[in-house]
């Protein structure tokens, strides 16, 4: 086994973080004129993404990123908190909402957007629907 250098830069970095902690960036509030709010509501999690018209991601959040773990990530309350965290960081003058998935968080996220008085141009459900494509997985037997 190779002996490790005590004065290596890697060791210094870890010692510095141990002593002084991580430096946290302050959250920036971003202003955009037109934007698209993508809501991906699966049964296990809800992911909210704000993009500009070209599709470049400006900010995103999810129920897991807001501190929820396990089955609580799929709840409507977790989706509400994730949407609030996005809306407080991004100021949008006009928005279109694209909803994907059929989880519990889709209605809760849309309700938060409407409650914060963001002018919504369109609400579109873009959940993929197979025209008899792949065979679905077998049903669970408990």
UniProtKB/Swiss-Prot annotation:
Taxonomic superkingdom: Eukaryota
Subcellular localization, as worded in the UniProt entry: Plastid, Chloroplast
Keywords: Chloroplast, Plastid, Ribonucleoprotein, Ribosomal protein, RNA-binding, rRNA-binding
Matching Pfam families: Ribosomal_S11 (PF00411)
CC per GO annotation: chloroplast; ribonucleoprotein complex; ribosome
GO function term, MF aspect, one: rRNA binding
GO BP annotation list: translation
Coiled coil: none
Main location: plastid
Signal peptide range: none
InterPro entries hit by this protein: Ribosomal_uS11, Ribosomal_uS11_sf
Quaternary structure, from the entry: Part of the 30S ribosomal subunit.
Family: Belongs to the universal ribosomal protein uS11 family.
HAMAP family recorded: Ribosomal_uS11 (MF_01310)
Protein name: Small ribosomal subunit protein uS11c
Gene name, Swiss-Prot/TrEMBL: rps11
